[in-house]
A protein has these predicted regions:
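Short, acidic, small-residue-rich periplasmic hinge/interaction motif at the N-terminus
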Residues: 22-60, 64, 68, 94, ...
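Outer membrane beta-barrel strand-and-loop segments of large Gram-negative receptors
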Residues: 323-335, 370-380, 450, 456, ...
Length: 692
């Protein structure tokens, strides 16, 4: 059993945490709602969650109606490549993140999980487009630091997405058309009781429609479709939800004929097909009996990805390459909460987590195949105390990992202390949380550890001044039992791993840490004028080396900054109908992702491995992509009519067409390091209509 460092254990004797009426900075003003009103829209599993609204997903620039891209505007979050929604949270690898839907853990719910990655390999944590439609979501949240005792299996960020129920009185429709895709949503009651509803949404990609008509983009055709369904039933004191998310995507690249067109990079030597499928099913419920409440559910989800790379012209040095990655996840949880009196409440529960992943990687003359996974059972208990501006929760979680070569059992204390006075608040959050090492287990066997424990401490001060809130946060994370591999004498930890590495390295024990400071301010109101939200963070992510020194990790970007500004102008048209013009502007900047040297792949195999040359880290992450900067713009016009509300919007990502470096790889055809750039100016026009 691994115990949280003893110097922090005395804090367990301190009352701690959360103020449910705490002011929260939003994109358009300040959430300052009574507790009951907040709960009517989104009940965060913990006040630690930074909640966001679906309206913000629709309104803010650069989101493309993807909640993950909205989360990229939050403090401490870096979008690793703007072609996709992989997020590094406070210097952690995106593999440290976890997606939850209605409180249940699910697999990566994104199409084209290979988007924006180093060698077009699929990943376990992000992708180009989210398969969960924003039209299905209620207001949701994101946890970037400590977790409540109910949640685990993530040491980076946790997406806490919530499905909204359908309308229980009459049928309603929504339709949306744009350069991302075409959506059609239908919701309405089932029966006459007014207690049961359905909500379904179907979507097909705009690029897929163009591909069906024979149009491609630089030799590539990209398609995706998804279908979301939610059945909801409520009764006095309780509710039941059944949901499903299914979809598929493909990205097909046709290499040019070298006799007709000059080859400019190694990619053009091949025909490349990428296909993926996602399936997510779940059930969640809650019920209250007097002072007792019960909630829980289960989910089953899986993803299947298949990438094939066939040479346009067969030759001994241009072999085919195939890669499949098929993760699956089953999750179940149950929580019992009891309100003891006006000051105390108690919670007790358990979470079951079973994750398996299989893969096959073939380079022509050789390859790798296998699987990885683990099963975990985590009972937990918590106590909440609140009085006179002080709210406290103390919890302990016991995460047990088995069905691995080495079993692990972690005690994970969770404490969170917050005190409010005179429009100010001070919060201390201390805890530990663990996660299994799936990506690392796929790359090497055996591992020194199959699950790791991360300790963290967050200290946050906030103050409200009129319509404005300012916040300052200090945080640190430590993973003393991390794993990594050595390249010469340099240790590359798991915190620098996102994609598959074809070298199959031998892993060793490692120690990692992340620490930083965040400053944030927000205020104004879209109802009354201009509003803004801005943040800046300074941070480091490091791994201890053999000589005891600390070296920067891949996602140690040094700094990140965001600023969003917006305003709406309501008016009446000539027929006295409501019309609103809106403007939103966002600036995003951060330090560059780090990388090693790009060199040829030396291997005894004479096959396509040379087209997937891994970086040389013998001298560490000595290079950087340089400062990233991107301005986004969104203009929209909303018309409210008797039976409909329509919105015409122009969303422009990278409005200044800034050239940002994405990565540097070794091109075996050109025989030199080659730069890839992130997205330039991307205009997205959309039209949305809601029938009331």
């Amino acid at each position: 059993v691994r115990i949280f460092p003893s110097l922090l254990l005395p804090l367990l004797l301190t009352v701690f945490t959360s103020a449910h009426s705490q002011d929260t900075i939003s994109f358009g003003g300040i959430y300052d709602l009574p507790g009951a009103e907040v709960r009517a829209t989104y009940t965060p599993v913990s006040p630690l969650a930074q909640r966001f609204t679906v309206e913000e997903v629709y309104r803010l620039p650069g989101t493309f109606y993807d909640p993950a891209r909205l989360v990229a505007l939050l403090p401490g979050v870096v979008q690793t490549n703007d072609q996709a929604n992989h997020l590094s949270v406070r210097g952690n690898t995106p593999n440290a993140n976890l997606w939850r839907l209605n409180g249940l853990a699910i697999v990566n719910p994104n199409h084209t999980a290979n988007a924006g990655t180093f060698y077009d390999f699929p990943t376990l944590s992000g992708g180009g487009v989210n398969a969960i439609s924003a039209q299905m979501l209620g207001n949701s949240g994101f946890l970037s630091g400590g977790l409540p005792v109910e949640y685990g299996y993530a040491t980076g960020g946790t997406f806490d997405l919530r499905l909204r129920p359908g309308n229980k009185t009459r049928r309603k429709y929504q339709a949306q058309a744009g350069f991302i895709g075409f959506d059609l949503m239908v919701e309405g009651p089932i029966g006459d009781s007014g207690k049961t509803s359905y909500l379904v949404n179907g979507r097909y990609s705009f690029t897929g429609l163009l591909a069906d008509m024979g149009v491609d983009f630089g030799g590539e055709s990209i398609r995706f479709w998804d279908f979301n369904a939610h059945l909801h039933h409520e009764w006095d004191g309780g509710e039941l939800s059944l949901f499903s998310i299914v979809g598929a995507s493909s990205n097909v690249f046709a290499g040019p004929d070298s006799t007709e067109q000059e080859i400019t990079e190694q990619k053009e030597l091949f025909d490349i097909d990428f296909d993926s499928e996602v399936q997510i099913y779940g059930l969640s419920f809650s019920h209250q009996v007097k002072t007792n409440s019960f909630r829980g559910g289960f989910s089953a989800s899986k993803v299947k990805t298949d990438r094939s790379q066939m040479p346009v012209n067969i030759s001994p040095t241009r072999n085919a390459a195939f890669f499949t990655l098929d993760p699956g996840l089953f999750n179940a949880n149950f929580v019992w909460e009891k309100k003891i009196n006006e000051f105390y409440s108690f919670k007790l529960g358990v979470e079951y987590f079973d994750q398996t992943t299989t893969y096959e990687l073939s380079f022509g003359n050789g390859g790798l195949s296998g699987g990885a996974g683990y099963t975990s059972l985590a009972p937990f208990v918590g106590l909440v105390y609140s009085i006179n501006g002080l709210t406290a929760e103390v919890g302990i979680r016991n995460s047990n990992y088995f069905n691995t070569p080495v079993s692990h059992s972690f005690l994970e204390p969770r404490i969170d202390l917050q005190y409010e006075w005179n429009r100010q608040s001070l919060r201390l959050n201390v805890g530990a949380q663990s996660r299994g090492l799936i990506a690392e287990d796929l790359m090497a066997f055996p591992l020194p550890e199959y699950a790791v424990l991360t300790n963290h401490l967050d200290l946050t001060y906030s103050r409200r001044i009129g319509e404005h809130i300012v916040k300052a946060a200090l945080y640190c994370q430590s993973t003393p039992n991390d794993v990594g591999f050595q390249d010469n004498s340099f240790i590359v930890s798991s915190n620098s791993i996102l994609e598959f590495d074809p070298r199959s390295p031998d892993f060793v024990s490692a120690e990692t840490r992340r620490y930083g400071v965040e400053l944030e301010a927000g205020g104004g109101s879209k109802q009354s004028g201009w509003y803004y939200r801005g943040s800046i963070g300074l941070f480091n992510a490091e791994t201890q080396q053999v000589d005891g020194s600390w070296a920067k990790d891949r996602f140690s970007n040094d700094f990140n900054g965001k600023l969003t500004i917006g305003r709406e102008w309501p008016r009446l048209d000539k027929k006295q109908r409501e019309t609103t013009l809106g403007l939103n502007f966002a600036l995003i900047t951060h330090g560059g992702e780090r990388y090693g040297r790009s060199i040829p792949f030396t291997s005894t195999f004479d096959d396509s491995r040379r087209f997937f040359a891994p970086q040389d880290f013998s001298n560490g992450f000595i290079n950087s992509n340089g400062t990233y900067f991107r301005p986004d713009l969104r203009l929209y016009k909303t018309k409210t009519r008797k039976k409909t509300t329509t919105t015409l919007a122009l969303d422009v990502q990278n409005a200044a067409n800034v050239q940002n470096l994405g990565n540097v790889y070794y091109d075996a055809f050109l025989e030199q390091p080659t730069e890839r750039y992130q997205l330039g100016l991307i205009p997205v026009l959309s039209y949305r209509i809601v029938w009331r």
